[in-house]
Amino acid sequence: MASFRRFRLLSPLKPCVTFGRMLYTRIDKDGLTMLAGHLAYVSLLSLVPLITVIFALFAAFPMFAEISIKLKAFIFANFMPATGDIIQNYLEQFVANSNRMTVVGTCGLIVTALLLIYSVDSVLNIIWRSKIQRSLVFSFAVYWMVLTLGPILVGASMVISSYLLSLHWLAHARVDSMIDEILRVFPLLISWVSFWLLYSVVPTVRVPARDALIGALVAALLFELGKKGFAMYITLFPSYQLIYGVLAVIPILFLWVYWSWCIVLLGAEITVTLGEYRAERHHAKNVITQSPEM
């Protein structure tokens, strides 16, 4: 009787254990931490060029002139915890210096920013084991679209949010508290949609929408929890500040970027493993149904 109860308790957990083993094997085989380190290095190299190009795009659209200040605060508050103010000051100085660059230097900034997108593309296709190669023209078009349309869409969403909050009839309708709650989960929604687009569009193979949504949701939740945990760690255990002093912002930024890419790639591994697990179960069912006939 005890063994029967144990079997009943373990049987619902068996799919989870099997999926966990497949996920761990895949993460170990792909070298997730090494890939995340590569992307973290490229991200730090491309960070200033990427931010320069993004805010140059905002400057080209008058409707984003006022919202760009709020967007800066939103990005650094929600995507760079703990030391966002210090990093923001340094990056704004770098961006201000880059405005004095020549045309050749500006082209170099754009190429460096595109280098990050190319690296993300390469790493995700390694995870998906894709051998399909895009043409150079198509790849450049996709990279440029991500570089230009992504910031514009985020800026447009913030413009709409600010517009909704400015409407007087919302206060009378008593829905302002609901909008406040929506804006509170706005970073989570942006992360979820961004990861879903990343897992759906970047791989050169077809990715089931449901798998991409699940993987993106896990990554978005871990990203939000990671922000709070990282900020708590930096605040409660200020070892980096004690060791590095004023230079502590450098290892802290690198550590956060590395941790962020680990989360992004984990979401990608979950997305891929969901498809492989489903295919494995389908194959096992076919073997069971065919065995009596044999």
Curated annotation (Swiss-Prot):
InterPro entries: UPF0761_bac (IPR023679), Virul_fac_BrkB (IPR017039). It is found in: Cell inner membrane. Keywords: Cell inner membrane, Cell membrane, Membrane, Transmembrane, Transmembrane helix. It is a multi-pass membrane protein. The chain crosses the membrane at residues 44-64, 67-87, 108-128, 136-156, 185-205, 212-232, 246-266. The keyword Oxidoreductase does not apply. Belongs to the UPF0761 family. HAMAP family: UPF0761. This is UPF0761 membrane protein YPK_4186. The lineage of its organism: Bacteria, Pseudomonadati, Pseudomonadota, Gammaproteobacteria, Enterobacterales.
